[in-house]
């Protein structure tokens, strides 16, 4: 509304468009009022979308490992790989970029990055006595498994990196 959301017609229409887009994302028969928080979320999503392809190409993602501990023995049985994206001095967490990657059809490429990083890690651990035999679990989307060449790509990774394939949990 004038003047709260702008003094120029183009500025007001741009903000109305942002609100309309968000209402459409929520489903049919919805409405959304524009506010500055909405604008910040949209700008952040646009920023992430713009940087995501570059992050995939340059392999800017990192894996962090969360231990899975056997309650009875207190021993670490395996690790869960958690993807993180360091960007300009801050961490972009999966809940911020995974939905955008899925929406833009990039989730398969991210899964490939995670698989390769996990395989590389397991290969490096293969020679370390205290880490040998420790498995890594990764979360993958059902969409990834249904892609025709998923298993071929997985087989190529397993043949390239030398480790016991049973140590990779999908």
Identify the residue ranges that each predicted region occupies:
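Catalytic core of bacterial c-di-GMP phosphodiesterases, primarily the EAL and HD-GYP domains
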Residues: 12, 31, 41, 71-80, ...
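Active-site core of bacterial EAL-family cyclic-dinucleotide phosphodiesterase domains
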Residues: 33, 44-100, 137-139
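Catalytic strand-loop-helix junctions within cyclic-nucleotide turnover domains
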Residues: 1-12, 37-41, 68-73, 85-89, ...
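Cyclic-dinucleotide signaling modules
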Residues: 1-46, 50
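Active-site catalytic microenvironments for nucleophilic, acid-base chemistry
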Residues: 22, 84, 100, 117, ...
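Conserved long alpha-helical elements within nucleotide-processing catalytic cores of c-di-GMP signaling
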Residues: 17, 21, 95-99, 108
């Amino acid at each position: 509304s004038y003047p709260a959301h702008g003094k120029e017609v183009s500025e007001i229409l741009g903000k109305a468009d942002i609100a309309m887009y968000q209402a459409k994302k929520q489903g049919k028969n919805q409405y959304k009022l524009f506010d500055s928080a909405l604008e910040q979320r949209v700008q952040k999503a646009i920023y992430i979308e713009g940087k995501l392809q570059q992050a995939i190409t340059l392999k800017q993602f990192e894996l962090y490992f969360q231990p899975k501990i056997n309650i009875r023995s207190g021993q670490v049985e395996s690790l869960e790989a958690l993807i993180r994206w360091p960007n300009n001095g801050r961490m972009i967490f999966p809940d911020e970029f995974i939905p955008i990657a899925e929406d833009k059809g990039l989730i398969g490429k991210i899964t490939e990055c995670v698989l390769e990083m996990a395989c590389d890690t397991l290969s490096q651990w293969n020679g370390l006595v205290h880490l040998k035999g420790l498995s890594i679990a990764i979360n993958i989307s059902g969409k990834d498994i249904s892609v025709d060449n998923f298993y071929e790509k997985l087989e190529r990774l397993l043949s390239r990196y030398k480790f016991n394939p049973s140590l990779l949990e999908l």
